[in-house]
């Protein structure tokens, strides 16, 4: 049976491949594939934003090699940044429940 972190890694990888290659390179997300992934898989991150300029800026920031697509490494950097932001947010909350062992 897979541990929670192993399951999380599986979801991270399988989610990328669920959306990549629908329109081109199967190992990269183009702009519309990334937008679909974010809209369906991270709806709280985007909220009700449909601001094309903001999305274009996000795409530009993620696309570190400037090939107009987001590869798996760029996707992982993005998810890591979101995880760090979530961690920083929750560090400000007092522990109300004991930690699981």
From Swiss-Prot:
The GO biological-process annotations, alphabetized, read as: epithelial to mesenchymal transition; positive regulation of canonical NF-kappaB signal transduction
Taxonomy of the source species: Eukaryota, Metazoa, Chordata, Craniata, Vertebrata
Q: Which domain of life is it from?
A: Eukaryota
Summarize the protein's role. Answer: Calcium-binding protein that plays a role in various cellular processes including motility, angiogenesis, cell differentiation, apoptosis, and autophagy. Increases cell motility and invasiveness by interacting with non-muscle myosin heavy chain (NMMHC) IIA/MYH9. Mechanistically, promotes filament depolymerization and increases the amount of soluble myosin-IIA, resulting in the formation of stable protrusions facilitating chemotaxis. Also modulates the pro-apoptotic function of TP53 by binding to its C-terminal transactivation domain within the nucleus and reducing its protein levels.
Query: What name is this protein filed under?
Result: Protein S100-A4
- Origin species: Homo sapiens (Human)
Which GO terms of the molecular function aspect are on file? actin binding; calcium ion binding; calcium-dependent protein binding; chemoattractant activity; identical protein binding; RAGE receptor binding; RNA binding; transition metal ion binding
Task: Indicate the principal place this protein occupies in or around the cell.
Answer: secreted
The terms describing its cellular component in GO are: collagen-containing extracellular matrix; cytosol; extracellular exosome; extracellular region; extracellular space; nucleoplasm; nucleus; perinuclear region of cytoplasm
Q: Which Pfam families match?
A: S_100
């Amino acid at each position: 049976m897979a541990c929670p972190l192993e399951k999380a890694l599986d979801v991270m990888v399988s989610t990328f491949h669920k959306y990549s290659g629908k329109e081109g390179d199967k190992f990269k997300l183009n702009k519309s594939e990334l937008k679909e992934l974010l809209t369906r898989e991270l709806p709280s991150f985007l909220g009700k934003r449909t601001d094309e300029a903001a999305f274009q800026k996000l795409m530009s920031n993620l696309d570190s090699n400037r090939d107009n697509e987001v590869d798996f490494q760029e996707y992982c950097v993005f998810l890591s940044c979101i995880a760090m932001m979530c961690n920083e947010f929750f560090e400000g909350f007092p522990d109300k429940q004991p930690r699981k062992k």
